[in-house]
Design a protein with these regions (language model features):
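A conserved SF2-helicase RecA2
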Residues: 320-323, 547-584
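Cys/His-rich short segments
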Residues: 364, 373-457
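Accessory, non-ATPase domains that flank or precede helicase/AAA+ motor cores in DNA-metabolism machines
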Residues: 1-310, 322-338
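Conserved helicase ATPase core of P-loop NTP-dependent helicases/translocases
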Residues: 235-246, 465, 471-494
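Conserved RecA-like helicase motor core of SF1/SF2 enzymes
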Residues: 274-288, 292-293, 485-490, 495-544, ...
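Conserved RecA-like helicase motor-core motifs
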Residues: 203, 223-234, 403-404, 410, ...
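Conserved nucleotide-binding/hydrolysis modules and their immediate coupling elements
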Residues: 1-33, 109, 416-421, 435-440, ...
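Conserved interdomain linker/interface between the two RecA-like ATPase lobes of SF2 helicase motors
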Residues: 297-298, 305-308, 314-394
Length: 610
């Protein structure tokens, strides 16, 4: 069976090897699909992430090419000349050639005859005499939709200063730290516009496809067909087309998820990584690359600027920025100086003591009723990404932690608690070691149950859900987004997908149903992730003329992550988290490696690995 391969180098001298070298049966591509710069990137991926050549190559080459996909084309009729002297009895030809002249390259021969009543005989005659010709035109299978024109927004003084600081920066690596609603997207667009006018290209990365409807709407509305979109929901043919458009210079602005970083952009001048704190920029499939590291390498390779944008940067990125490894640019105020929405922490232990066993606190329920009466919209957020069944006491909020690693232990169905860092196990106690309560349970609730509860208590509310189940179909995120934007629903229930990037002026209440879900992940970044997600979700409220309100439900309201999030105090949170990381030796003070072993005999495998 023939095997596909890539030629990376040519050697004139004979190479002696211990294996049989097979002949090349055919060369699939007339022109190289891998450039010298690509080879440098491939070698970086191999050395940095310990992957095979072919795994690195596949990141750069779309699946469509590997499966033999080609550009889709059609033959259109193109005008050449209207000199009819060579045609005898040319009556009636002038009307035909004038129509083609007005619509050159627009219609196929079949469309001209069937839809516009043009005689096939006359078309063939005009082709025969060289007055028109049939020409192949590439048909792109995606992204043909027209978008409303996006008008440039007037910049605030702070935005103008940020743009100037970035453009004048001698450093190519820049952290743009801007509070939610501060206008980071408009800053991105102005920077992209400058790069494009210089004849260069730009890449704008977003964490996942859920964010792209609004980003696409704005960027396509501003830059039109010059935008290429690249993400996992495209078919192989569509991915090939977008790759081809970028390679041929037909699209200079790329918007996509992490894989878009590998597109063959011509004269790359700018890479923007929006919401840089998101863990979706790290690939969990081979090769397990970190997009930010790849972007930094490309920046050194091509001399382009890289902007990491976030309201809540990772501890590592902020540490690098304040220690001078990258330039720090800040946007500290919302557009029109709108206030950040007021955030309230609700102690769910008190709710339980008062006899309320609903997933909604009395405060959240009352606020939901008020907003619905005013015709305002609500977002209910349930953080289930990386969801882990931790065990907690509902009476006092105690969570069963590992004494060695200071992270929550995970509940397993055999009744044991396991630390996924050091492997420590212990049987789940029946009583809380802190308060002696019997009300010890593992934690969990899904979006479907939340929807049921809303329908039970707020019967007239119109509800939309945005989660993995409701967004499997193509363009489903955009349909839900557009429906909520158009006011077709009062309440949007969602997971991580609703936490950022969405701008709904009529949303005045955000309810975070359980801050404890992210706070008790078995991960040293649990506090950081909680601070980030709460700040990001809170930023969805009060983005219009009306003030917003955020209600956070938790069994541990005293936790420093929630207390700093309530005040939108990133700097003090950073100082606290930084101190803890230093004590524990966690990044940026050390590196954590996960080494997986696969074998039939567990004891033998342990010996080999140790």
């Amino acid at each position: 069976k023939p095997v596909e391969g890539f030629i990376l180098d040519l050697k004139e001298e004979e190479i002696k090897v211990s294996f049989k070298i097979k002949n090349i049966l055919s060369v699939e591509n007339e022109e190289p699909v891998i450039t010298e710069e690509d080879l440098k990137l491939i070698n970086f991926l191999r050395e940095e992430y310990l992957c095979k050549y072919i795994d690195a190559i596949r990141l750069l080459i779309p699946v469509g090419i590997l499966k033999g996909a080609k550009s889709k084309s059609r033959s259109v009729i193109v005008y050449i000349d209207d000199n009819l002297e060579s045609i005898k009895n040319s009556d009636g030809y002038l009307e035909v050639i004038n129509f083609i002249k007005r619509n050159t390259g627009k219609y196929t021969k079949s469309e001209l005859t069937k839809e516009h009543g043009v005689s096939l005989y006359k078309l063939n005659k005009l082709i025969e005499h060289g007055l028109i010709k049939s020409e192949k035109e590439i048909v792109f299978r995606y992204n043909t939709r027209e978008y409303n024109k996006d008008v440039e927004k007037k910049l605030t003084a702070e935005q103008s200063m940020a743009i100037e600081a970035i453009e004048d920066s001698e450093e190519n690596l820049i952290l743009l730290k801007g509070v939610t609603g501060s206008g980071k997207t408009e800053v991105y667009m102005r920077l992209v516009e400058k790069v494009l006018t210089e004849g260069k290209s730009a890449i704008v990365l977003v964490p996942e496809i859920a964010l792209t409807p609004q980003m696409i709407e704005r960027f396509k509305g501003r830059f039109g067909s010059n935008v290429a979109l690249f993400h996992s929901k495209l078919s192989d043919g569509e991915r090939f087309d977008e790759w081809y458009r970028v390679k041929e210079g037909k699209a200079s602005l790329i918007i996509g998820a992490r894989s878009a970083i590998f597109l063959p952009a011509r004269k790359l001048g700018l890479i923007i990584i929006d919401e840089e704190h998101e863990n979706t920029y790290k690939s969990d499939q081979n090769p397990k690359y970190q997009t930010k590291e790849v972007a930094e390498f490309i920046s050194k390779l091509k001399g382009c600027k890289v902007i990491l944008g976030s309201a809540t940067p990772t501890i590592e990125s902020y540490y690098r920025a304040i220690s001078g490894e990258m330039k720090l640019v800040e946007l500290n105020h919302r557009i029109d100086n709108r206030p950040m929405p007021e955030m309230k922490l609700v102690d769910m232990r008190e709710e339980l003591r008062s006899g309320n066993k609903s997933i909604f606190s009395r405060r959240l329920y009352a606020s939901m009723q008020q907003k619905l009466e005013k015709g305002e919209q609500i977002i209910l957020f349930l953080n289930r990404r990386g969801f882990s069944t931790f065990v907690s006491c509902r009476s006092c909020g105690y969570v069963f932690d590992c004494e060695n690693c200071d992270i929550s232990m995970t509940y397993h169905k055999n009744g044991f608690l396991v630390c996924h860092y050091c492997g420590k196990t212990k049987k789940q106690p029946n009583l809380c070691p802190k308060c002696g309560s019997k009300y010890v349970k593992f934690f969990g609730a899904g979006t479907e149950r939340v929807e049921e509860e809303v329908r039970k208590y707020l019967k007239n509310a119109k509800i939309l859900r945005m989660d993995v189940d409701t967004t499997r179909a193509k363009d489903s995120h955009e349909k839900i987004y557009n429906a909520f934007k158009a006011g077709e629903a009062d309440i949007l229930i969602g997971t991580q997908m609703v936490s950022k990037g969405l701008d709904f002026p009529n949303v005045t209440l955000v309810g975070i149903l359980s801050a404890d879900m992210s706070l008790n992940l078995p991960d040293y970044r649990a506090a950081e992730r909680s601070f980030q997600i709460i700040t990001q979700v809170a930023g969805r409220a009060g983005r219009g003329e009306k003030e917003g309100e955020v209600i956070v439900q938790t069994y541990t309201p005293e936790h420093y992550s929630l207390q700093y999030a309530k005040k939108y105090d990133y700097e003090d949170f950073y100082e606290k988290e930084f101190t803890i990381r230093a004590m524990m030796g966690y990044p940026p003070f050390g590196r954590i490696l996960l080494i997986n072993g696969i074998g039939k005999n567990e004891d033998e495998l342990k010996k080999q690995m140790i």
